[in-house]
Amino acid sequence: MSAFEQAAREQAARLRAEIAQHNIRYYVYDEPSITDADYDALMRELMALEAQHPELVTPDSPTQRVGAAPLAEFGSVRHAVPMLSLGNGFEDEDVLAFDKRVSDTLREAGLLGPAEQAHYFCELKLDGLAISLRYENGELVQAATRGDGQEGEDVTANIRTIRAIPLQLRAGAPAVLEVRGEVLMNRADFEKLNQKQAARGEKIFVNPRNAAAGSLRQLDPRVTAQRPLRFFAYSWGEVQGLSRDDAPAFDEASPGLVSTLPRDTHGGMLDWLAGLGLPVNVRFNHKAQGAEGLLAFYRRIGAERGSLPYDIDGLVYKVDALAAQRVLGYVARAPRWALAHKFPAEEATTELLDIEVQVGRTGAITPVARLKPVFVGGVTVTNATLHNEDEIRRKDVRIGDRVIVRRAGDVIPEVVGPVLEKRSGELPQFVMPTHCPICGSAIERLVDEAIARCTGGLFCPAQRKQTLLHAAGRKALDIEGLGEKLVEQLVDNGSLKTLADVFRLNAFELAALDRMGKKSADNLVAAIDQARRPSLGRLLFALGIRHVGETTARDVARHFGNIDAIMDADEAALLAVPDVGPVVAGSIHRFFQEAHNREVIRELEKQGVHPQAEAQLQSGDLAGKTFVLTGTMPTWSRDEATRHILAAGGKVSGSVSKKTAYVVAGEEAGSKLVKARELGVTILDEDGLKALLSQ
């Protein structure tokens, strides 16, 4: 090698190291060490040097982050160690209960003294996207989204464009290392991105998380390369190939945990990851003892939340000692040694411009607040539910008021109440209309009911549209392609008046509609044909009878066997169906007493719709047992799980009670899981459910 070539090699190495250091200062510590112009000059110098000497280009060079060619689609990646969810806490009492459970368990195991407090590692709950990075021999070889926790999407090409993520780890990296962390976008970067998007006439993102998600799921990595994404590591998955002294020994009872690692605490492991060159949020990571220590940190960060450079939606508390984590173990695919402590809903004030009413599938009249646009909880809110007339009276909300609007996460925004000191003069109270704003039919409110209803039935276009959408839904007739926009067109042009009209649709008529071509029309007609032989329970559910859910519809169908028997049944006969009470029996009886509803059944038969009898319940150990499903399961959808439970003779309910036999909890399980624990109900994960069903 000539002296000139050696000098070029050394210069390239120096530039790569300097740029990497500037990336760490900017993307990890949020403390730029040089100007953008100076940074760009370094990049140009390195690019020119590598252009002159292609043999100097390395996989981890910052010049290799510009983005590869566009992808046709994202592949799937099976996580070597599942990416688990966390239990949630919202109140101080939840944190106190968490600390008590942890402390009691550790004392029983002899890992905590009688007067000793548990030690925790606290982290910010970043509002971004969870990602798993896989390094082999120190080189980034794969990156995947969390997905369902078991399997995610392959976003390697996009992840390689993020400057905060090292393409090559420092010396000492194990043979295999899975790193878990969060991809996010700073608020300031988000604002700049939206300004650029607006200037180009392109999509404006709602919030930083939305922008980060959209950027990471670009099929063209060159677009991702232009987005200011950041990354912080907060955990690990598979680890292999450490030195003999540090070789990990995986505990099968605690997936994802190891009995030996380079460090024996969670905080120590993050220090180890940082030492390998991975970005760790050292600025805000914190150690605390006992519940009071956790709550003190929560209050501190809550006060500083608005001044943080990025969005967070809470804190995460983890038992620090890895040995203690193994003892505590898991429940329903979530660790017992960790808790996500969420911040309360965000609130803002704005003007209530109007109160309008919407008409639902069963004729329910729901008041909706039309608001002067206000940014709250990460989105711009213009509408909020007011639930019913009594709720409006209770809150004393009036058109023209300044009102408090609350939103938390993806929850529907709600009007909390008026700011009375801002009320000017005597504003009139809201009065529920006496006639439906859509069809003009009378609105009635039955005694002891909070909801007012339009009496128009299928004569009302609003109810007709919602009823038809319900009937086409996945849990009813499952007519793929018959969506909201299409139903709206077909109702408005007079093609759809009853459910039977769906089965009169033809490809020629459909192809002439807006946004419908021949292929879409043919596919829809095929889906309609497939729906001509539904189970009797699905057909009964599709009719949209008030108070009749899918489980009740199935029970009634199984009891009577055919549609004529159901139509002819009086209330006494309906009450003989298990779990059917007077309200449901009365609702079904009244529905089929209406001549036009019976006529719809006859028209369906003329169109070749012939419901099939429901399979009879098995008489095994699960016969009659009630299951409740909560959260997202790794491989089964709720419909699949429900189908398997019903096939085994079990029942599926939407609420937990003393009669519940099992709660099947997946990821992001909520209040149902909490209630199950309180009542001592047996809790299963998906694997446990499958094992139970196979017995």
Curated annotation (Swiss-Prot):
UniProtKB keywords: DNA damage, DNA repair, DNA replication, Ligase, Magnesium, Manganese, Metal-binding, NAD, Zinc
Active site: 125
Binding site residues for Zn(2+): 436, 439, 454, 460
Catalyzed reactions: NAD(+) + (deoxyribonucleotide)n-3'-hydroxyl + 5'-phospho-(deoxyribonucleotide)m = (deoxyribonucleotide)n+m + AMP + beta-nicotinamide D-nucleotide
Residue numbers binding NAD(+): 36-40, 85-86, 123, 146, 182, 318, 342
Cofactor(s) for this UniProt protein: Mg(2+); Mn(2+)
GO MF: DNA binding; DNA ligase (NAD+) activity; metal ion binding
Location of the BRCT domain: 617-695
A Gene Ontology BP annotation from the UniProt entry: DNA replication
A GO term from the CC aspect: cytosol
Enzyme Commission number: 6.5.1.2
Family label: Belongs to the NAD-dependent DNA ligase family. LigA subfamily.
Function comment: DNA ligase that catalyzes the formation of phosphodiester linkages between 5'-phosphoryl and 3'-hydroxyl groups in double-stranded DNA using NAD as a coenzyme and as the energy source for the reaction. It is essential for DNA replication and repair of damaged DNA.
Protein known as: DNA ligase
Species this protein is from: Bordetella avium (strain 197N)
High-level lineage: Bacteria, Pseudomonadati, Pseudomonadota, Betaproteobacteria, Burkholderiales
